Amino acid sequence: MAVAVSSSWSGSSSLMTPHTITVSGLPVHVYGLPALTVPATSSAGLAVVFVLHGRTESHEHPSIMGIVNRVVESARERRLAPDGKGAKDLLVVTFDQRNHGHRTVDRDRNLGWMEGGRKRAQVRKDKGMQAHELDNVSHATDMLACQVGTSRDVSFLIDFLPPALFPHDERTVTDWYSVGFSLGGHATWLALAHEPRITLGIPIVGSPSTHTLLTNRAANLPAPAGPLPLSAPYFPRTLMSLFDALDPDRTTRDRWTGKKICVLSGADDHLVDYYKGGSDKFVEKLREWGVEVDAWVQPNTGHACTPEMIERICDFIWRRGLSPEKGKL
């Protein structure tokens, strides 16, 4: 595997300027390197948090950059405070998910069964599409495939980012976290469930059950395009078996031991509803299992990551991840 390596230490760079490296053809953007303590004298731990973007977006989308910039800034401020001595350093990592950003192959395969909005309505009109025609027949398969692919990219980068980023063994990564918005929130749930090295996760308007989320969407797709049957070609048997094997809410208790999770949702989110998407029931189950879960459904909020959510993200990462005290919320 070819890994392109450039100098990882750039102390004169802006804290918000990404250091981009290529890991086996995947551009990876790393924020926070200038804030690291001196490698030769540092005994502090080092946490890396992946921030995963939403469907049809990219690593540069404003919703992601708002999270990235504030998380880097907040961690730096808190670590420099009097009570921050001994806290872990933090790096924030972004990359484009499969079929998104620079990895786009077929944009239509990122669409739902029926996309809303005036822009899409005009596209459908220009293409001569009929009211009953779907934008993307394979939406369910494409959604799960992208989510799982992203979670596996996270595992891949946990393996290969350290040698690419620190070729002279300047630092050792001690902790791995994941934060994700929408599609990235689904992928964060999957990373929590299937990657034991991810110990802290914050899914934002994400679902731990793609099966629950998508079957609800299919059943409620308005006529004349819907409702859709829960069978082929929309839900092939092979896809149903993947839901059984992969959906986080179908995994066993041992997968969640020691995990720290903060679930953020909008009360008026009609795309990934906290209840219809299965988050409420799974959060209850996790709490029954003794897993530390902080869940907040923000009133008067739709499918968005708000400034209030971003502050909760920063606070959770600090208190449950970076802080030398690790006090409970």
Residue spans for each PLM region:
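A domain-start/cap signature at the N-terminus of enzymes
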Residues: M1-A47, L329
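Short, surface-exposed "cap/lid" segments of acyl-processing enzymes
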Residues: G25-N110, Y274
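Alpha-helix termini
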Residues: P34-S43, R70-D89, P162-R171, A245-R255, ...
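The feature captures the conserved acid-bearing segment of alpha/beta-hydrolase catalytic domains
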Residues: V38-S43, L200, T210-W289
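Alpha/beta-hydrolase-fold catalytic nucleophile elbow
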Residues: F95, V179, I204-V205, L264, ...
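Alpha/beta-hydrolase active-site loop
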Residues: D108-D169
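Primarily recognizes the serine-hydrolase "nucleophile elbow" in alpha/beta-hydrolase
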Residues: S155-A223
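C-terminal catalytic histidine-bearing segment of alpha/beta-hydrolase fold enzymes
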Residues: L271, K276-L329
